[in-house]
């Protein structure tokens, strides 16, 4: 029996020695990210969309963000910027934009820009209660963006309260 145990121990030691450092690896060790992975490809396309969006070429940006999301649906920033690009093209896109703002926030609940621009969308549609709720969340995430959203909400309230009045003389 002792000979049998020694033989098993020797065999196990030989296997470890032959396998080298790989035998000591742990399952949770990080794996290298392969080039051309879906997320990596999506980010390249997304970055192209950002350039187009900054140039105010919203239909072209929309197409790039949609392509990025087709490659990797889990990119919250692409959902946010797709929603922005849709919103900037007119009210006929507001429902679709809202779905993408909501998805961005599902994926990344602390994405301040999505609260900011969804709040603007709510303001544009007259839903000041939901715009104010997004403003309250922004106060915890990004006070500068919260101030910008507050200005949008206030300007809407002031505009609505003064409809039909003549402009003030300077």
Model features per residue range: what roles?
Residues 47, 81, 117, 151-152:
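Canonical tetratricopeptide repeat
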Residues 40-67, 71:
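Alpha-helical segment of the N-proximal tetratricopeptide repeat
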Residues 78, 114, 147-148:
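TPR alpha-solenoid repeat register
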Residues 55-67, 89-103, 125-137, 161-165:
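Structural signature of tandem alpha-helical TPR/SEL1-like repeats
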Residues 26-36, 132-170:
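Terminal, low-structured helical/coil segments at or just beyond the last alpha-helical repeat
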